Amino acid sequence: YCQKFLWTCDTERKCCEDMVCELWCKLEK
């Protein structure tokens, strides 16, 4: 899961379905 204050995105964990985390996931891909 994703913590809103950290905005972490991992391969094993699904990104937040919110706005920011999804963008970060693509950037850190």
UniProtKB/Swiss-Prot annotation:
Q: In which broad location class does this protein mainly occur, judging by the first location in its UniProt entry?
A: secreted
Q: Name one GO molecular function term.
A: potassium channel regulator activity
Q: In which tissues is it expressed?
A: Expressed by the venom gland.
Q: Which UniProt keywords apply?
A: Calcium-activated potassium channel impairing toxin, Disulfide bond, Ion channel impairing toxin, Neurotoxin, Potassium channel impairing toxin, Secreted, Toxin
Which Cys pairs are S-S linked? C2-C16, C9-C21, C15-C25
The answer on whether this UniProt entry bears the keyword Disulfide bond reads yes
Q: Does the keyword Disulfide bond apply?
A: yes
**Localization per Swiss-Prot or TrEMBL:** Secreted
Q: Which GO terms describe its cellular component?
A: extracellular region
- Entry comment, domain topic: The presence of a 'disulfide through disulfide knot' structurally defines this protein as a knottin.
Also noted in the record is: Negative results: does not show activity on insect voltage-gated sodium channel (Nav) or insect calcium channels (Cav) in cockroach DUM neurons.
Family named by the database record = Belongs to the neurotoxin 30 (phrixotoxin) family.
According to its UniProt entry, the function of this protein is described as: Insect-selective neurotoxin that potently blocks insect calcium-activated potassium (BKCa) channels (Slo-type) in cockroach dorsal unpaired median (DUM) neurons (IC(50)=3.7 nM). This occurs in the absence of any shifts in the voltage dependence of activation. At high concentrations (330 nM), it partially inhibits cockroach delayed-rectifier potassium channels (Kv) currents. May interact with the turret and/or loop region of the external entrance to the channel and does not project deeply into the pore of the channel.
Q: What is this protein called?
A: Lambda-theraphotoxin-Ec2a
Q: Which species is listed as the source?
A: Eucratoscelus constrictus
